[in-house]
Amino acid sequence: MIADFEGDIRNLIDTKVEGEIPVLATRNMVMFPGVITPLLIGRESSMKIVKKMQKDPSVIIGVFCQKQSDIEYPTYSDLYDTGVYARIIRVMEMPGERGEMTIILQGLGKCKLDSLTETKPFLKGITTPIMDVLPDTESWEFKSLMKNLHQTTAEYIKKNEDMPDESRFALKNISNDVVLVNFICANMTFSVKEKMSMLEENSLEERIYTTLRTLNKEISLFDIRNSIRDKTREDLDEQQKEYFLQQQIKNIKEELGKGEGSYDKIELEKASMGKMW
């Protein structure tokens, strides 16, 4: 899901929160500041958080990713301690007996999970806001860095068959640099650990450099995989040619002597050159 932001991004990501707040634990999904994110909700405790947010849309929650996705009842040590504040935008209940729902969350500012204070009926915790250090977006250095990020991400999307067309559209149409950087971090097919290393960077410039290193590494891996695939295809083509040539020689043998006699292989290959196969 794509959403741009007009105006001073600090108004969105400078989040003030006091006291304990609901904590939503996610599996294999890392939220980033300013990014709108759809999320499938299936856990009963998570559904209770959503119902609370539906009653009061002003409720702000903390979203933290689990270190291991198979843990059903995460504790403090099971969560990465860097996450994002979020506010609910929309809830869509899914058909079926399982009662799952998809929620749309607006990412706000970054935060640190200091402690979990409750586990039932859902997780609650104490958090500390973390304000990213934003650069001068009008400086020549930052514009050059963003241009590099644009070009490298476009190459990554082109070579990654798993990336949806929406990503190309976003790259062209998100005008806010902070939102674009965080959108790339959130939506490229990086691992959770790679995304967390990006989120944990408190400087936007350093986050871009971390993202560029990951993008370039992935592009190199794509190139290696494609090279291996092309080489394998060439080897297979040569094997097929050799097989068809041997079959042709066999057929010529049968035509000339029903398989009898001792035609030289070179002569047979010469004779086969005029055949269609």
What are these regions (language model features)?
Residues 1-277:
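N-terminal low-complexity, acidic/polar interaction/targeting segments
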